[in-house]
């Protein structure tokens, strides 16, 4: 479960494209930032590229990217490249059959597009051609079986597109002012569609004729879509975007918005900032906001769960001491786990959050303001400083809590049992990771 939002230059406060995503996945699944430099390949030696489940032809050159990657996948939940191309994907549930083995995940497609495309339109064309050639699918769950199709929000400094898919079929629409996608099909009108889209719906009895056709109504699988509550989250995101003239801080506040009561630990699946603990146990495990300006684009990343508590650090594409490089998966996982250990104290109610949040937000506001007003040359140093401040805050909280046992006192019985079991498994995973170092 996820939420991705965009606002075009014609609508934003400073005339630059804004883009953001909350990635909602299993609360114990590490998801880390990874910088991957541009690369050249000898296709005689490496003709193919292995994705999460399948291999596809390699290309001679791939572009520099930074991605947010679930630790066990090749692909990514969101990311951006050296040209300022940004992409986020969503799980959508459709009536088309899911390919359960030998499929290409939406995350794999996202990373491929970032590595191979310079613009939003080029990425859109790449993705529509790709899903017609390669079946999307494969298990996308962590510790569970979870199958779905994908929608994508794609943006560069000037253009943004929504792409929704159902198996090999697709529709897309260009964004005029602002848009939000979630875990539901939403394009009842579109600018283009795949061949056979309407005919397939008629053949399957989902509509009677071309005049009767509605993509959302015909292709939506109703049960999973209902329980995912993507429609509710999308309505809220569109409402907040509709308040007008958004900037970076407004986008951050949207990612932090809750549907439930603030004093309750559990924020249901209908909340943009999602807290696990209900029957559907997903949680926001990584977040980011982009201000897109081509090669001068800037980013604000959590690299951690729960954006309502975690801080958004400024980042520019390139090497950063706190961001994993290609091949440094354990470093990336370790960064996420350190933050996750601290967050479990807050989730449990063992540590009070208000004072910590206020202190962290003050630091966050200061470094965002400095970063946005700084020269390109100064931004790298400000970014490193922000990551270091964040690390000190996290380590201090862990140090303050070292004598306290995590005791889940918030929420109902199901919530407490859920988090007790998840945290036990998390520490077993941490112990295993430490042994393998």
Where are these regions (language model features)?
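Short, well-structured alpha-helical segments that form the helix of a local strand-helix-strand
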Residues: 123-132, 248-262, 384
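Short, Gly/Pro- and small/polar-rich lid/capping loops
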Residues: 1-10, 263-272, 408
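A contiguous strand-loop segment
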Residues: 2-106, 126-249
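Acidic, low-complexity N-terminal propeptides/linkers enriched in Ser/Thr/Asp/Gly that mediate export
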Residues: 4-11, 279, 380-437
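Short N-terminal edge-element motif at the start of the domain
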Residues: 250-282
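Short, well-ordered beta-strand elements within core beta-sheets of diverse protein domains
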Residues: 110-117
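Substrate-recognition/cap regions that form aromatic- and gly/pro-loop-enriched pockets
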Residues: 269-403
């Amino acid at each position: 479960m996820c939420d991705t939002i965009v606002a075009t230059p014609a609508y934003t406060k400073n005339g630059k494209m804004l883009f953001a995503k909350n990635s909602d996945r299993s609360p114990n699944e590490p998801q880390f930032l990874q910088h991957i430099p541009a690369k050249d390949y000898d296709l005689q030696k490496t003709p193919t590229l292995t994705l999460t489940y399948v291999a596809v032809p390699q290309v001679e050159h791939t572009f520099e990217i930074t991605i947010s990657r679930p630790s066990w996948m090749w692909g990514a939940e969101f990311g951006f490249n050296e040209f300022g191309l940004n992409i986020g994907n969503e799980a959508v549930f459709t009536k088309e059959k899911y390919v359960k083995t030998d499929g290409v995940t939406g995350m794999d497609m996202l990373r491929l597009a970032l590595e191979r495309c310079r613009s939003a339109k080029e990425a859109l064309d790449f993705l529509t051609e790709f899903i017609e050639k390669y079946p999307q699918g494969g298990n996308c769950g962590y510790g569970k079986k979870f199958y779905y199709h994908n929608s994508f929000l794609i943006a560069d400094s000037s253009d943004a597109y929504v792409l929704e898919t159902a198996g090999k079929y697709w529709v897309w629409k260009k964004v005029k002012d602002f848009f939000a996608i979630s875990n539901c099909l939403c394009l009842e009108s579109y600018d283009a569609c795949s061949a056979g889209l309407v005919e397939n719906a008629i053949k399957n009895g989902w509509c009677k004729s071309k005049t009767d056709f509605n993509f959302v109504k015909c292709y939506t699988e109703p049960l999973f879509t209902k329980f995912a509550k993507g429609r509710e989250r999308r309505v809220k995101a569109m409402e907040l975007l509709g308040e007008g003239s958004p900037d970076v801080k407004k986008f951050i506040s949207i990612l932090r918005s809750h549907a439930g009561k603030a004093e309750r630990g559990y924020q249901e699946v209908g909340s943009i900032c999602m807290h696990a603990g209900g029957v559907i146990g997903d949680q926001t495990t990584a977040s980011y906001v982009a201000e897109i300006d081509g090669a001068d684009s800037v980013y604000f990343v959590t690299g951690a769960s729960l954006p309502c508590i975690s801080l958004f650090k400024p980042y520019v594409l390139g090497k950063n001491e706190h961001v994993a490089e290609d091949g440094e998966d354990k470093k990336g996982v370790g960064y996420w786990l350190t933050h996750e250990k601290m967050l479990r104290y807050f989730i449990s109610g063992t540590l009070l959050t208000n004072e910590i949040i206020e202190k962290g937000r003050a630091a966050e506001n200061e470094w965002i303001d400095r970063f946005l007003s700084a020269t390109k040359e100064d931004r790298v140093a400000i970014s490193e400083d922000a990551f270091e401040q964040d690390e000190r805050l996290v380590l201090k909280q862990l140090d303050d809590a070292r004598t306290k046992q995590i005791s889940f006192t918030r929420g109902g019985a199901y919530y407490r049992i859920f988090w007790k079991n998840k945290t036990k498994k998390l520490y077993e995973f941490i112990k295993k990771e430490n042994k393998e170092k």
